Amino acid sequence: MQTPADRQDRHVYPSHWEADIVLRDGGTARVRPITVDDADRLVSFYEQVSDESKYYRFFAPYPRLSAKDVHRFTHHDFVDRVGLAATIGGEFVATVRYDRIGPGGMPASAPADEAEVAFLVQDAHQGRGVASALLEHIAAVARERGIRRFAAEVLPANNKMIKVFTDAGYTQQRSFEDGVVRLEFDLEPTDRSVAVQRAREQRAEARSVRRLLTPGSVAVIGVGRAPGGVGRSVLGNLRDAGFTGRLYAVNQAYPDDLKEVDGVPAHRSVRDIDGPVDLAVVAVPAEQVPGVVTDCGEHGVQGLVVLAAGYAESGPDGRERQRELVRHARTYGMRIIGPNAFGVINTAAGVRLNASLAPEMPRPGRIGLFAQSGAIGIALLSRLHRRGGGVTGTTGVSTFVSSGNRADVSGNDVLQYWYDDTETDVVLMYLESIGNPRKFTRLSRRTAAAKPLVVVQSAGSAPQGHAVRATRLPHATVSALLRQAGVIRVDTITELVDAGLLLARQPLPAGPRVAILGNSESLGLLTYDRCLAEGLRPAPPLDLTTTATPADFHRALSQALADDTCDAVVVTAIPTIGEGAVGDGELAEALRSAAEGAHGKPVLVVHVELGGLAEALSAAGRTAPQPHVMAPGAFGGPRRPRTATPQSAADTPPAAPTARPAASPSAGSAVRPGAVPAAPGAARTPPAPVTEDVRPPAAQSGSRLIPAYPAAERAVRALAEAVKYAQWRRESVDPGKVPEYDDIDEKGAAELIGTLLERGDGLTLGTEETCALLGRYGIPVHRALPSPTPEAAVSAAADLGYPVALKATAPHLRHRADLGGVRLDLADEGQLRRAYTELTELFGPPGELRPVVQRMAPRGVDTVVRAVIDPAAGAVLSFGLAGAASQLLGDTAHRLIPVTDRDATSLVRSIRTAPLLFGWRGSTPVDTPALEELLLRVSRLVDDHPEVVAVTLEPVVVARHGVSVLGATVRLAPPPARDDLGPRTLPAY
């Protein structure tokens, strides 16, 4: 059977141009090439466009398309004539096309590099960012086809279209002639166009998540009539949480006369609901999900939470079901959390959404929580609840997402939402896998600059249900790159909660200086030792003795906080001894009172056998309880009644200064084909009015809670992470610059690379080619002359000049001086011949050893510099000392390319063996500025030429003055595709 691709004029159908996109309002659409089979769709699309929009497109009244027009707009060669369409529900909502032109605007073919571009967007979908997204995609297509410049003619009154072009960030020229505005712009991405694209990406993806977390109406599909079952549980959780919007129970098995389930309107299908549905929670078996998705899409549901299992986690068949699920949902513009998801929670008083399997609503607070695993998610909610104390506060949860297989909505999307969410101050994430490390690193850097981001990443293999890009980088390298991006990387969920509590409750420390005080000398010394081990600078502990009273603690803490030589205070406490024993509440109040004047310094408590103190510290100063909050037994143990005790108005905390709106899904949205339209001017299912939001502002005066830890190492580890993060925040304000070097020959290097790649798609360069390429970037490599015979070695030494080194370069001996395959400081021919004989007698004939002779470099510290382009993480620069010991210990530091001058300085000092470069134990310090310059030059080479996919300089001898590169290898290959520089797309399925 002939396909549309077979019937195109010249080229096969370019399926790689197909993409799913997120629109400005958070909905989705599909972009694809227009084919000859789209004639009817095109005509139907055009009939729904207003006369005004048609006039703007054709500069004259144009009520309908002629047969000739339809043929022209559906027949493309995908080179000189290209058309793309944005579709929702399989129908066109917008089109864009380009036609290659030559001088005078006449039709042309390659190598002409200019094209005329034109758009048409249905009026119902204008304002959703469709044209802006299509411009990104048609520009990428044009660049692929050798077009470097677009021209567009627009009527002056068509301000929307003019704005699409001018806001895109491309370098452009504008002229006015014969009543028409002519815009011309280069398609080469600029810093501004990339910034515009990423800002649009952030807004669109954040809104798509916001629509899932702030629905005005929720339908739970799969609610049984009898108690029990997943659907019934979720419905009960939504009711118990006090969801402020409309709830619906859906089950195709309901009898016709059933009107309600637990007081919630009941329907056999989503299509039967009289009114819009913003979010559907799908709790039916996997085999029933496709029909449910169709019903939801036809009704205009905006998003799905799919709890059903039986997808990619179950094997190849399930993986295909998962792909089809995502494709099916995106056809209707819906986003999915799941499948195999645990659900979502939003504690905002204007929403109060618990669309999850969590039995009770978490305490409202300022922590955003993401977990791919439902089991880990419930454990994290439980731990935050147990250690949060009180009933509301900074250490409660703002929003919670458990994405399951994260087939669609991922941690990247939720990061986009939390980045500018005013109700979230700290982000905690448990990641079993990272689908797009390059994007995650970029988003993490931006998020961490605004609020702390703490991550636990599983070090093992990704679960079966997760789509993960292949990476050659070790887990430790990925962790190092995340730290470079400002991520607080911890190893366990205990450390995740420990760090999260400190960051949510206390200010960031200004430095590493720590005061320690308490009523136990032993516990104080233990804390002191842990501070030293974590790289902090503790002062000698102040021992208040075991008879210390709350007043003694208050006085000592106040004095420590007032001391300018202190950046943070750790209070240690054990049970008091003797008749003067005091209650935990009194001590907690004394500490809290002293900490209120902390002047921006964090306070932590380490306690032994004082569980009551930890609870009292968390509960100190607490205010009115929030209705429908988590009962103490919510996650195991005895359950208590959920009824809140009435409080007087005086006990109620002030409302948060910027409460999140209850729901705003209607802004800018359009009705999908087949959807139920809302009444004119009506909002989508407004939630019940809310008079106050009990979630307190992050820094409310007098309400700061002090985190308590049952072990010194846990408290100090959390503090150390806060210190490093605070330092990163300060340094991120000025990340440094990428230096320019006058002796770099970028053009010459590009020409050489192009010539070399003509031999094949991937090759490792020979010695001369490597030296030639590196030389164009000011990186000289010491000559190493092959010496297959003693006479050849003597001749090479005469050419190079004594003293020389003789090295075996066989793979099993290369860079292994510890095995004895290197002889140094050979001052004359006699020494050289003796060394040659020793090597061949010890290791075998020259044919196996591959000996080379090299002139001796100045003595110094042997190091290794590497750069590699990883398909998932991007370009990475690595540095470490040479030798087996460093390799075994994994003592290597990493930075993302391009590297700035500050990055290079930090990179050199990041390895544990860095003291060897700076005069350790009386040795001579080496030339680290020259080493940093070498790192910067390698970074420039790889950044300027993505065809350079791997560089290794080993060894690099760093001497007292200068560096010597004694060995180098370079690998070239066609550059891997970079989706971070292309048009905005959702992950392909």
Predicted regions, residues:
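Catalytic-core regions of core metabolic enzymes
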Residues: E188-Y989
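Long, contiguous binding/interaction regions
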Residues: M1-R211, P215, R239
